[in-house]
Amino acid sequence: MRQTYSFKKDFAGKTLKIDIGKVAWQATGAALVQYGETTVLVTVVASEEKKEDVDFFPLTVEYVERLYAAGKIPGGFFKREGKPTEPEILFARLIDRPLRPLFSKDFRNEVQVIVTVLSYDHENSTDIPSIIGASCAIMLAGLPFKGPIGAVRVGWDGKEWYINPSVALSNSLLLDLVVAGTKDAVLMIEGDGKEVPEEIFLEGIIRAHEQIGEVINFQEEILSMVNPVPFNYEPFVVNENLKKDVLEYVTVDQIRDAIFTPSKSERQKALEDLKKRVIEHFKPIYGEITAQIDEIINQEAKAILTKVILEEKRRVDGRRLNELRPVSCEVGVLSRVHGSALFQRGETQVLSVVTLGAGEEQIIESVIESEPKRYIHHYNFPPFSVGEAKPLRGPKRREIGHGALAERALLPLIPKEEEFPYTIRVVSEVLSSNGSTSMASVCGSSLSLMDAGVPIKTHVAGVAMGLIKEGEKFEVLTDIQGLEDALGGMDFKIAGTKNGITAVQLDIKVDGLSYEIIEKTLKQAKEARYQILDIMEKTISQPRPEISPYAPRIMVLEINPNKIGDLIGPSGKNIKKIIEETHTTINIKPEGLVYISAPDQESAEKAAQMVQEYTRDIKEGDIFLGKVIRVTDYGAFVEILPGKIGLLHISKYKTTGTGKNQTREEINLGDEILIKVDSIDPSGRISLSRKDL
């Protein structure tokens, strides 16, 4: 009989329940986590053998939503879940970030964490129980992990603070943050704000971290009861004799000269040539040593970089610690597109292109409800941007993650549909990469949106901040490039306007960040952001007054919702007629808003006129130019508006003369005649008259 455990705790006013040993017996570790009525199963499987010849920890995190969790049946022909959706990829990346830095550096066994969403209560998001469950499952597996960790969502509405707010409330808050960490330090931050000041952001991080200790204590209680067996693994250890021989064969000055080469491509070549020379020299003696040499050279390069930055306050390209690389901007770089911009920062170069469309919102299929997306940002990272030749096989997880981050950074500035009724797609093409491409795409997006005439009130800029740390000594680096990201301790991406922060994302390689480091980073990033925004404003300071002549024209009309049926007509007859005659696309909202998208202004105006005719209220005394569509013995039926027909009784015909000489006018099929609405009965039947006209 298997031993099962069930633990409960009140956490931010809701019940957090973790079941151990109930399901997934074959996994190395598993936890069934329920928060409110949202339930996730988190499993961890570790391979028994270490992965040879890799210089990284092979961790994979998968997040899988089963739509039955929210009582939904998947769309599409096959009616089953397929490849990971964008929300699933973003959640997987969110869960991965606080876990990865806490695994032992000598652990090279493959580890797969799978989070499966089993139940969703439409109130509690799945991210917080997923991170807590992943921490618990890893600890139960006995893996070499410096946990447990906790995670909390914190929100602010301008007055009140909320811990683990509901999904609906989170969507309406000025600040929405997910923070993960240990008892002593912060490991991961991800969130967005509506131009929130740095001080409020920091307060939110601190408030969240104060709650994390509760969750960690709860997990420690679970671990003390379950008492997991430590995972037995063969550690990755650098051969000390090889290390001694390498550092005698290669001098510190040679490594230093390689990493302090100004150009990225030249620096990479210098380091690769150095490693290649060392491998060729020692391979006959030690055998396959590629991973070992990578580790030795990288650790030595990191030590040199750390020493120079902490002691000399100097970076590999000669910049000061808080200095930006040279920034340049250009807008209107492509002629036929709706908006474009080229943003360059050092050797990082991004082309952002805007396309305006009508009624083409993106619908996301997920257990968590979301509004159709009117603003979409896609980020492409082709291999040529880093001087590589690789096959193109669609966007990778990193590209999806970076695209979503830049999207969130601009979203608070995107005008409401009532103000600007277009669907907006921005594509950022990375043309050259030397670090901080996601933040460059934020800047490029902002510039291209203004170039396209999208009425955003101000620019948004982003900057990536780095960290060099040794013991208690640390320095924060502004606008990190590739090497400083690879060898440094953090990549803290911060985007915003001059009014405040709109999006953040923190990745770290150290064991956590103190409040002091976070505060210094936010302050330094603000200074850099202001400098970038000043440069962007000199290029284009406000949106162009007109959209591109190549963009579709959209008109918005408001009609009485009760008239929607009149506009559509029987079997869609009326709306089809408008679309066919004007070559437009028409989208009708239930509240009575009619969106007309046309290739040119003339077509849009013609369609608008027809919509108004179909939905116009007819009143007694109104005069129309109508068309006779049927003639009978007792009168004529006249169409006064599309689909609106009245009876002109013979007694209401126009007459001439008097007495015996009085004659009634002759009306024939197809005649166009001026006519007046005489009366409308309670059932809506219209009586017409030609008298007195």
Swiss-Prot record:
Record-listed Mg(2+) binding positions: 485, 491
Organism superkingdom: Bacteria
Keywords linked to the UniProt accession: Cytoplasm, Magnesium, Metal-binding, Nucleotidyltransferase, RNA-binding, Transferase
Keyword Nucleotidyltransferase attributed: yes
Molecular-function GO terms, alphabetical: 3'-5'-RNA exonuclease activity; magnesium ion binding; polyribonucleotide nucleotidyltransferase activity; RNA binding
Required cofactor names: Mg(2+)
Name under which the protein is recorded: Polyribonucleotide nucleotidyltransferase
The S1 motif domain, residue ranges: 621-691
Source organism phylogeny: Bacteria, Pseudomonadati, Dictyoglomota, Dictyoglomia, Dictyoglomales
Pfam families, per database record: KH_1, PNPase, RNase_PH, RNase_PH_C, S1
GO cellular component: cytosol
Single biological process term from Gene Ontology: RNA processing
Domain KH: 552-611
PROSITE patterns registered for this protein in UniProt: KH_TYPE_1 (PS50084), S1 (PS50126)
